[in-house]
Amino acid sequence: RLDVAVNLLTMQALTKGKITVLGGSQIRPNIHMDDITDVYLHFIENPQHTGIYNAGFENISIGEIALMIANKVDTEIEIQESNDPRSYRVNSDKLLATGFKPKKCVEDAIEEIKNHYESGVLTDLDEYYNLKWMEKHKLYNLD
């Protein structure tokens, strides 16, 4: 998916040379796709752990994410006002107590997206954005 904060902003930097940040103070929890896959494997291999667990390890503001990207991609950051102050924070201490440890961080994801885009493996297609895909298939109207 390219419509979650880290992926979306990284692709903006790579394809437009500019990151547009709406607000910037909103917090988002982050987890690398490899780590979320490892969470599932961890519970399959450790069935004694049951219940509901949060899986998110880096609660970072959108503005901080943009700065992290700008440290790896030659881009400018444009901050625009936003009327959406929603922030989401996740505490994953319960998950960590089961012995699970994440292996990757947001900076790893930025670097991987950058490398995949520059090598031609990743392209900026509508099918990687949920709302664009749903509108294309007449499941949602963006207007």
What are these regions (language model features)?
Residues R1-V4:
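Flexible, glycine-rich beta-alpha linker
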Residues A13-G17, V21-D143:
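C-terminal substrate-binding subdomain of Rossmann-fold SDR/epimerase-dehydratase oxidoreductases
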Residues L9:
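Anionic-ligand binding region
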